[in-house]
Amino acid sequence: MAGLNPSQRREVVSLILSLTSNVNISHGDLTPIYERLTNLEASTELLHRSISDISTTVSNISANLQDMTHTLDDVTANLDGLRTTVTALQDSVSILSTNVTDLTNRSSAHAAILSSLQTTVDGNSTAISNLKSDISSNGLAITDLQDRVKSLESTASHGLSFSPPLSVADGVVSLDMDPYFCSQRVSLTSYSAEAQLMQFRWMARGTNGSSDTIDMTVNAHCHGRRTDYMMSSTGNLTVTSNVVLLTFDLSDITHIPSDLARLVPSAGFQAASFPVDVSFTRDSATHAYQAYGVYSSSRVFTITFPTGGDGTANIRSLTVRTGIDT
Protein backbone atom coordinates (compact mmCIF):
# COMPACT_ATOMS: atom_id res chain seq x y z
CA MET A 1 0.00 0.00 0.00
CA ALA A 2 2.91 2.31 0.68
CA GLY A 3 3.88 2.34 -2.98
CA LEU A 4 0.24 3.13 -4.28
CA ASN A 5 -1.21 6.48 -5.02
CA PRO A 6 -4.62 7.44 -3.42
CA SER A 7 -6.65 6.33 -6.46
CA GLN A 8 -5.01 2.92 -6.46
CA ARG A 9 -5.54 2.56 -2.78
CA ARG A 10 -9.33 3.23 -3.21
CA GLU A 11 -9.55 0.57 -5.84
CA VAL A 12 -7.85 -1.87 -3.54
CA VAL A 13 -10.27 -1.02 -0.78
CA SER A 14 -13.29 -1.44 -3.10
CA LEU A 15 -12.00 -4.80 -4.22
CA ILE A 16 -11.63 -5.94 -0.65
CA LEU A 17 -15.15 -4.78 0.13
CA SER A 18 -16.60 -6.55 -2.87
CA LEU A 19 -14.89 -9.74 -1.91
CA THR A 20 -16.25 -9.52 1.54
CA SER A 21 -19.75 -8.42 0.54
CA ASN A 22 -21.12 -11.89 0.90
CA VAL A 23 -19.78 -12.13 4.40
CA ASN A 24 -22.24 -11.35 7.05
CA ILE A 25 -20.61 -8.30 8.49
CA SER A 26 -22.45 -5.42 9.96
CA HIS A 27 -21.79 -1.84 9.15
CA GLY A 28 -20.63 -1.27 12.61
CA ASP A 29 -17.86 -3.83 12.20
CA LEU A 30 -16.41 -2.06 9.14
CA THR A 31 -16.37 1.39 10.61
CA PRO A 32 -13.16 0.86 12.62
CA ILE A 33 -11.53 -0.70 9.62
CA TYR A 34 -12.53 2.19 7.45
CA GLU A 35 -11.22 4.68 9.94
CA ARG A 36 -8.02 2.83 10.19
CA LEU A 37 -7.70 2.77 6.45
CA THR A 38 -8.50 6.43 6.29
CA ASN A 39 -5.85 7.14 8.87
CA LEU A 40 -3.51 4.88 7.01
CA GLU A 41 -4.16 6.79 3.81
CA ALA A 42 -3.54 10.05 5.59
CA SER A 43 -0.30 8.71 7.04
CA THR A 44 0.65 7.36 3.66
CA GLU A 45 -0.02 10.75 2.09
CA LEU A 46 1.99 12.46 4.78
CA LEU A 47 4.78 9.94 4.35
CA HIS A 48 4.71 10.47 0.61
CA ARG A 49 5.05 14.18 1.10
CA SER A 50 7.86 13.65 3.58
CA ILE A 51 9.62 11.34 1.14
CA SER A 52 9.14 13.94 -1.59
CA ASP A 53 10.60 16.62 0.67
CA ILE A 54 13.43 14.30 1.59
CA SER A 55 14.05 13.58 -2.09
CA THR A 56 14.16 17.30 -2.79
CA THR A 57 16.48 17.81 0.14
CA VAL A 58 18.66 14.93 -1.04
CA SER A 59 18.73 16.46 -4.52
CA ASN A 60 19.76 19.78 -3.01
CA ILE A 61 22.36 18.05 -0.87
CA SER A 62 23.60 16.17 -3.94
CA ALA A 63 23.91 19.44 -5.82
CA ASN A 64 25.64 20.98 -2.84
CA LEU A 65 27.95 17.97 -2.62
CA GLN A 66 28.77 18.34 -6.29
CA ASP A 67 29.53 22.01 -5.71
CA MET A 68 31.60 21.01 -2.70
CA THR A 69 33.39 18.41 -4.82
CA HIS A 70 34.27 21.06 -7.37
CA THR A 71 35.32 23.34 -4.54
CA LEU A 72 37.45 20.56 -3.03
CA ASP A 73 39.00 19.95 -6.44
CA ASP A 74 39.86 23.62 -6.60
CA VAL A 75 41.16 23.50 -3.03
CA THR A 76 43.19 20.38 -3.91
CA ALA A 77 44.67 22.14 -6.94
CA ASN A 78 45.41 25.17 -4.77
CA LEU A 79 46.98 22.92 -2.13
CA ASP A 80 49.12 21.27 -4.81
CA GLY A 81 50.25 24.72 -5.91
CA LEU A 82 50.86 25.66 -2.29
CA ARG A 83 52.80 22.42 -1.78
CA THR A 84 55.00 23.27 -4.76
CA THR A 85 55.43 26.81 -3.45
CA VAL A 86 56.23 25.54 0.06
CA THR A 87 58.78 23.08 -1.39
CA ALA A 88 60.41 25.90 -3.33
CA LEU A 89 60.32 28.05 -0.20
CA GLN A 90 61.93 25.23 1.79
CA ASP A 91 64.70 24.98 -0.81
CA SER A 92 65.12 28.75 -0.68
CA VAL A 93 65.16 28.67 3.12
CA SER A 94 67.81 25.90 3.02
CA ILE A 95 69.93 27.98 0.63
CA LEU A 96 69.37 31.06 2.79
CA SER A 97 70.33 29.07 5.88
CA THR A 98 73.58 28.01 4.18
CA ASN A 99 74.22 31.62 3.13
CA VAL A 100 73.46 32.86 6.65
CA THR A 101 75.89 30.29 8.09
CA ASP A 102 78.55 31.40 5.61
CA LEU A 103 77.86 35.05 6.42
CA THR A 104 78.08 34.23 10.13
CA ASN A 105 81.48 32.62 9.62
CA ARG A 106 82.63 35.57 7.53
CA SER A 107 81.31 37.96 10.15
CA SER A 108 83.28 36.11 12.83
CA ALA A 109 86.43 36.29 10.69
CA HIS A 110 85.80 39.97 9.96
CA ALA A 111 85.21 40.58 13.65
CA ALA A 112 88.60 39.02 14.44
CA ILE A 113 90.25 41.12 11.71
CA LEU A 114 88.53 44.26 12.98
CA SER A 115 89.67 43.45 16.51
CA SER A 116 93.25 43.07 15.26
CA LEU A 117 92.93 46.30 13.28
CA GLN A 118 91.55 48.02 16.35
CA THR A 119 94.54 46.83 18.37
CA THR A 120 96.88 48.07 15.63
CA VAL A 121 95.05 51.39 15.46
CA ASP A 122 95.29 51.75 19.23
CA GLY A 123 99.03 51.05 19.05
CA ASN A 124 99.42 53.49 16.17
CA SER A 125 97.46 56.08 18.10
CA THR A 126 99.90 55.75 20.98
CA ALA A 127 102.85 55.94 18.57
CA ILE A 128 101.33 59.00 16.87
CA SER A 129 100.80 60.65 20.23
CA ASN A 130 104.44 59.98 21.11
CA LEU A 131 105.53 61.32 17.71
CA LYS A 132 103.46 64.45 18.24
CA SER A 133 105.10 64.92 21.61
CA ASP A 134 108.57 64.35 20.09
CA ILE A 135 107.79 66.72 17.21
CA SER A 136 106.61 69.33 19.67
CA SER A 137 109.81 68.94 21.72
CA ASN A 138 111.96 68.98 18.57
CA GLY A 139 110.09 72.04 17.36
CA LEU A 140 110.99 73.86 20.56
CA ALA A 141 114.62 72.72 20.23
CA ILE A 142 114.75 73.82 16.58
CA THR A 143 113.23 77.16 17.50
CA ASP A 144 115.90 77.59 20.18
CA LEU A 145 118.63 76.65 17.68
CA GLN A 146 117.24 79.10 15.14
CA ASP A 147 117.29 81.84 17.75
CA ARG A 148 120.87 80.99 18.68
CA VAL A 149 121.95 80.90 15.01
CA LYS A 150 120.31 84.26 14.40
CA SER A 151 122.07 85.60 17.46
CA LEU A 152 125.42 84.29 16.17
CA GLU A 153 124.75 85.67 12.69
CA SER A 154 123.87 89.06 14.09
CA THR A 155 127.05 89.19 16.18
CA ALA A 156 130.00 90.84 14.47
CA SER A 157 132.51 88.47 16.10
CA HIS A 158 131.78 84.98 17.42
CA GLY A 159 134.27 85.47 20.26
CA LEU A 160 135.59 81.91 20.05
CA SER A 161 139.21 80.79 19.84
CA PHE A 162 140.47 77.43 18.64
CA SER A 163 143.54 75.44 19.60
CA PRO A 164 145.57 73.35 17.15
CA PRO A 165 144.85 71.26 15.17
CA LEU A 166 141.79 73.51 14.70
CA SER A 167 142.12 76.92 13.10
CA VAL A 168 139.73 79.64 11.98
CA ALA A 169 139.99 81.95 8.99
CA ASP A 170 137.29 84.25 7.56
CA GLY A 171 134.74 82.73 9.94
CA VAL A 172 135.46 79.17 8.78
CA VAL A 173 136.83 76.57 11.22
CA SER A 174 139.16 74.02 9.64
CA LEU A 175 141.22 71.05 10.77
CA ASP A 176 144.93 71.02 10.01
CA MET A 177 145.45 67.52 8.65
CA ASP A 178 148.65 65.61 8.01
CA PRO A 179 148.22 63.86 4.63
CA TYR A 180 150.40 61.02 5.90
CA PHE A 181 147.93 60.40 8.72
CA CYS A 182 144.43 61.03 7.36
CA SER A 183 142.57 62.14 4.26
CA GLN A 184 140.44 65.23 3.84
CA ARG A 185 137.15 63.38 3.73
CA VAL A 186 133.99 63.42 5.80
CA SER A 187 135.13 60.45 7.90
CA LEU A 188 138.91 61.26 7.81
CA THR A 189 139.60 57.69 6.70
CA SER A 190 143.17 56.46 6.04
CA TYR A 191 145.95 58.64 4.65
CA SER A 192 145.80 60.64 1.46
CA ALA A 193 149.54 60.90 0.65
CA GLU A 194 150.83 58.47 -1.95
CA ALA A 195 152.99 55.56 -0.82
CA GLN A 196 156.68 55.68 -1.77
CA LEU A 197 159.43 53.15 -2.31
CA MET A 198 162.79 54.84 -1.71
CA GLN A 199 166.04 53.01 -2.52
CA PHE A 200 169.40 54.16 -1.20
CA ARG A 201 172.68 53.01 0.38
CA TRP A 202 173.33 53.28 4.12
CA MET A 203 176.62 52.68 5.89
CA ALA A 204 176.16 50.98 9.29
CA ARG A 205 178.85 51.14 11.97
CA GLY A 206 179.68 48.23 14.29
CA THR A 207 180.29 48.95 18.00
CA ASN A 208 180.81 46.82 21.10
CA GLY A 209 181.75 43.66 19.26
CA SER A 210 182.92 45.16 16.00
CA SER A 211 184.76 48.22 14.85
CA ASP A 212 183.98 47.56 11.24
CA THR A 213 181.46 49.21 8.93
CA ILE A 214 179.17 47.56 6.41
CA ASP A 215 177.45 49.03 3.39
CA MET A 216 173.70 48.22 3.25
CA THR A 217 171.38 48.45 0.27
CA VAL A 218 168.06 49.76 1.62
CA ASN A 219 164.50 49.54 0.28
CA ALA A 220 162.28 51.83 2.36
CA HIS A 221 158.55 51.40 1.74
CA CYS A 222 156.71 54.46 3.07
CA HIS A 223 152.93 54.29 3.42
CA GLY A 224 151.00 56.70 5.60
CA ARG A 225 152.86 57.19 8.86
CA ARG A 226 154.71 53.90 8.49
CA THR A 227 158.10 53.16 6.90
CA ASP A 228 159.26 49.56 6.50
CA TYR A 229 163.00 48.88 6.06
CA MET A 230 164.33 45.95 4.03
CA MET A 231 168.19 46.04 4.14
CA SER A 232 170.80 43.70 2.71
CA SER A 233 174.59 43.94 2.87
CA THR A 234 176.93 44.18 -0.08
CA GLY A 235 180.05 43.17 1.89
CA ASN A 236 181.26 41.49 5.07
CA LEU A 237 181.17 42.63 8.68
CA THR A 238 184.00 41.57 10.98
CA VAL A 239 182.82 40.72 14.51
CA THR A 240 184.98 39.97 17.56
CA SER A 241 182.46 38.74 20.17
CA ASN A 242 179.21 36.82 20.43
CA VAL A 243 177.10 40.02 20.44
CA VAL A 244 177.42 43.07 18.23
CA LEU A 245 175.80 46.50 18.15
CA LEU A 246 175.10 47.97 14.71
CA THR A 247 174.38 51.70 14.53
CA PHE A 248 172.43 53.46 11.74
CA ASP A 249 172.74 57.24 11.44
CA LEU A 250 170.82 59.24 8.82
CA SER A 251 174.02 61.22 8.28
CA ASP A 252 175.69 58.04 6.95
CA ILE A 253 173.27 57.65 4.03
CA THR A 254 175.38 57.87 0.92
CA HIS A 255 172.56 58.46 -1.54
CA ILE A 256 170.03 60.85 -0.01
CA PRO A 257 166.42 59.69 -0.73
CA SER A 258 163.73 62.00 -2.08
CA ASP A 259 161.92 62.45 1.26
CA LEU A 260 164.30 62.12 4.19
CA ALA A 261 161.56 63.22 6.64
CA ARG A 262 159.84 59.87 6.14
CA LEU A 263 162.86 58.18 7.74
CA VAL A 264 162.55 60.16 10.98
CA PRO A 265 160.49 58.36 13.65
CA SER A 266 157.81 60.10 15.67
CA ALA A 267 158.57 61.11 19.24
CA GLY A 268 156.17 58.48 20.55
CA PHE A 269 157.87 55.72 18.56
CA GLN A 270 161.32 56.74 19.89
CA ALA A 271 160.17 56.19 23.48
CA ALA A 272 160.52 52.37 23.35
CA SER A 273 162.59 49.68 21.70
CA PHE A 274 161.24 48.03 18.55
CA PRO A 275 161.63 44.53 17.04
CA VAL A 276 164.11 43.81 14.27
CA ASP A 277 164.54 40.62 12.22
CA VAL A 278 168.22 39.87 11.52
CA SER A 279 169.70 37.05 9.43
CA PHE A 280 173.23 36.41 8.13
CA THR A 281 175.72 33.71 7.15
CA ARG A 282 178.73 32.86 9.34
CA ASP A 283 181.16 30.15 8.33
CA SER A 284 178.65 28.79 5.78
CA ALA A 285 175.97 28.54 8.49
CA THR A 286 172.86 30.69 8.25
CA HIS A 287 171.60 32.39 11.41
CA ALA A 288 168.34 34.25 12.00
CA TYR A 289 167.38 36.19 15.11
CA GLN A 290 164.68 38.49 16.31
CA ALA A 291 166.55 41.35 17.89
CA TYR A 292 165.56 44.77 19.15
CA GLY A 293 166.55 48.29 18.24
CA VAL A 294 166.49 51.54 20.16
CA TYR A 295 166.70 55.19 19.11
CA SER A 296 169.26 57.40 20.82
CA SER A 297 168.02 60.41 18.86
CA SER A 298 165.56 61.08 16.07
CA ARG A 299 168.31 60.36 13.51
CA VAL A 300 170.26 57.48 15.11
CA PHE A 301 169.19 53.97 16.14
CA THR A 302 171.19 50.91 17.19
CA ILE A 303 170.30 47.23 16.93
CA THR A 304 171.85 44.50 19.10
CA PHE A 305 171.97 40.89 17.92
CA PRO A 306 174.01 37.70 18.50
CA THR A 307 176.83 36.94 16.09
CA GLY A 308 176.25 33.17 16.12
CA GLY A 309 179.54 32.27 17.83
CA ASP A 310 182.57 33.40 19.85
CA GLY A 311 185.76 34.94 18.59
CA THR A 312 186.54 36.86 15.45
CA ALA A 313 184.63 36.03 12.30
CA ASN A 314 183.22 37.56 9.16
CA ILE A 315 179.47 37.58 8.68
CA ARG A 316 178.02 38.09 5.24
CA SER A 317 174.64 38.27 3.50
CA LEU A 318 173.39 40.34 6.42
CA THR A 319 169.70 41.26 6.13
CA VAL A 320 167.79 43.56 8.44
CA ARG A 321 163.99 43.94 8.44
CA THR A 322 162.18 46.44 10.65
CA GLY A 323 159.72 49.31 10.53
CA ILE A 324 159.09 52.69 12.18
CA ASP A 325 156.18 55.08 12.70
CA THR A 326 156.94 58.57 11.45
From Swiss-Prot:
Family to which this protein belongs: Belongs to the orthoreovirus sigma C protein family.
Source organism per UniProt: Avian reovirus (strain S1133) (ARV)
A GO cellular component entry from the record: viral capsid
Main subcellular location of this protein, as a coarse class: virion
Source species, domain of life: Viruses
Coiled-coil features, chain-numbered ranges: 60-80
Protein name in UniProt: Sigma-C capsid protein
Pfam families according to UniProt: Reo_sigmaC, Reo_sigmaC_M
Family matches, as CDD domains: RBP-H (cd07964)
Quaternary state and interactors: Homotrimer.
Function as written in the Swiss-Prot or TrEMBL entry: Structural protein responsible for cell attachment. Induces cell apoptosis.
Subcellular location: Virion
UniProt entry keywords in alphabetical sequence: Apoptosis, Capsid protein, Coiled coil, Host-virus interaction, Viral attachment to host cell, Virion, Virus entry into host cell
Transmembrane intervals: none
Protein's GO biological process: symbiont entry into host cell; virion attachment to host cell
Disulphide-bridged cysteine pairs: none
